[in-house]
Amino acid sequence: GVQTCALPICMIDINKIPSPCYVMEEKLLRNNLSLIKSVKERAGVNIILAFKAFALWKAFPIVREYIPFSTASSKFEAQLAFEEMGSPAHTYSPAYTEADFPLILRYSSHVTFNSLSQFHRFYPMVRADGNRVSCGLRINPEYSDVETDLYNPCAPGSRMGVTGDLLGDTLPEGIEGLHFHTLCESTSYDLERTLAEVERRFGRFLPHVKWLNMGGGHLMTRKDYDVEHLIALLKGFKERYPNLELIMEIGRA
């Protein structure tokens, strides 16, 4: 179960804490969540929780007060979102199996595919399910500030997402959104440069889709993060593409 204490961690005798266990300071969590919610409301974007960085489900009742939705990368994370966050997941995985995909559909509101061939393979199952989920395609803007190629999803030869040259002038019927994930503990200026590349390589699609998921890596709770620049950047992008719902994934922040 969950034990609560009104004292800050600095005033608790850590030797009396049963081990092993997770210890979380609620005040600090709420401080971060309050900032994230403020960005969400001021910029008019949707910010969702990324389980890969924070999946302490006993804290979800607190998180839901600020962020009601989450992202998943497996059927089990999607189930966690549905059952413990109380909302269907925005799901992306580099690969799906036909055995697992019905569960992905059951627990998701959005499903992003890594390639066109993957979309064409599974879209009949989406249609058979009544088109309840919104389908997206992961794109590779061929630009990232990540310095180590091993962790760079845009490195030469990367198979994470579709490059612009592999797409024609229109997206296949059924694709309602685009998704990129190229940042890691990055700044708002990194996002600005990335969005410029997304517009340059995929701008022809942006007026015609419903949403753009900008992935994770937005460390907006870091002390030196320029939150005001982020809000202005997002507002400006929405002014150019008023049809788009902008989605950000928050994990470590």
Regions found by a protein language model. Give the residues of each.
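A short small-residue
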Residues: I12-I17, E176-H181, G215-G216
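Active-site-proximal beta-alpha core segment in soluble small-molecule metabolic enzymes
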Residues: V45-W211, L233-G236, R240
